[in-house]
Amino acid sequence: FQSYTNTLLLGQTVWPDHDMFHSCDTVCGTLMARSKAISGGPVYLSDAPRDFIKENIFPLIDEQGKLFRPEAPAVPMPESILTNPLWSGKAYRVAAPSGNGAMTLICYNLNVSPRHQQVQAIIKKEDYSLRNSFEKMSATSEERVLLYNWESQKAEELSDSSTFELIGFTDKLFHLCPIRKGWAVIGVQEKYLSPSTVQTISLTENRLELNVLCTGTLKVWIENSGKQELRSISIDTPQKIVIEK
């Protein structure tokens, strides 16, 4: 968490470096991998190549090994800035702007006390408005927002707030995606920074054109004639695609 705090101070001028991690770490390998993704910094592994865990590495990169990066480095959410997440008894939250107007957010339980083995975390619609802190005029209070749980692959419109439990030393990754003209572009599911895996070329009430930057399962939220659908589209090669409602 010190790296996130340092970024709040130094990230105004430089991209951070969250240091190395072991992909084979059975306690926090996946947690550290996701923190590297949202940090926007370099990624380097310290385990021996024979010990690499591809499930923790491939979600960071495309087929050529290029990192998917946020538009700005992740920093703590306001309520987490002046806390020590090891002893606070509360969830620790960080966020970064990702592609297509989305904001990626990670909620952690880093508490070391057995009394706080389980903590409650909450994501509010107003959290998305903080994207303005990274990029001017990117979000408004009237913007509709989709909350996407990366692990469960479930999506819902975030009309007010969503509450959930963090049990043990763990994290949960979410994407807050704007719903515009009945579309919300989530991106390729297999990558941690899903919104950074696609580029929106054009968007109308009935048609969406995207440039998909890697292979995998493209997730798009579609609203049409009063119905809502989380559509999954298989992408076997990076390409431009057109989606009709």
What are the language-model segments listed below?
Residues 21, 44-45, 51-55, 77, ...:
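Flexible loop/turn segments at secondary-structure boundaries
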Residues 33-40, 45-46, 50-79, 169-188:
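Aromatic- and carboxylate-lined catalytic core of secreted/periplasmic carbohydrate-active enzymes
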Residues 36-39, 44, 82-143, 173-180, ...:
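Carbohydrate-binding surface patches
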Residues 54, 121, 156-164:
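Short, polar loop/linker segments at the starts of domains and inter-domain junctions
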Residues 158-197, 218-220, 229-245:
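C-terminal beta-strand-rich structural cap/linker in extracellular carbohydrate-active enzymes
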